[in-house]
Amino acid sequence: MASTQAMGMTEQQKKSVDEMVEKATNMGVNVQAQNSAVVSMINQTNVSMTFNENHNWSGSVVGTGYPKSIPTKQSRQFIHQGDAKDGSQGAVVYYGSNANGEPCGWLLAWCAPTNVTPTKPNRVYVDCGAQSKFDTISWDTIKAKLDVGPATTNFTDVDTETTIAAGVTSTGSFASVGAAFGLST
């Protein structure tokens, strides 16, 4: 199974992630978010995506919870309230299909510390591919990858031709996380 954890995003991925970060920032400002990650995700596939699962290392979702679905070509948002010590650290998995109708999954993980420092920066980690890859997730492995992740990243699974790109930035009292779930074709 071939896959690529890429260092640089395509222009389209960067544009999409920047738009989602801006949406998250606007939402965070509107609700006066504190010590949280405001997450905005866009579905750039050709079918609706459904929420499969989440994992919280620190903090929890607030408000209406995780979006149950993300219709094609639309975005959805949620707020993950951090705890006072470690901030917001969590992950979500959404299921959908690739261009061939094969079941696929997209994973987004983020770390938005309470106090961002050079040694404790905001981070994201992403993964995608065949749905079976996400049947049993080692959350310890995901956390280890997140702990060394960058502030922006993207991933392409060449077997399923799926992609995911994400970025996180500090916005005063909260972090804005943007992600684009897509196809490489």
Swiss-Prot record:
The lineage of its organism: Eukaryota, Viridiplantae, Streptophyta, Embryophyta, Tracheophyta. Signal peptide: none annotated. This is Jasmonate-induced protein homolog. It holds the Pfam family Nakanori. Belongs to the jasmonate-induced protein family. It comes from the Eukaryota.
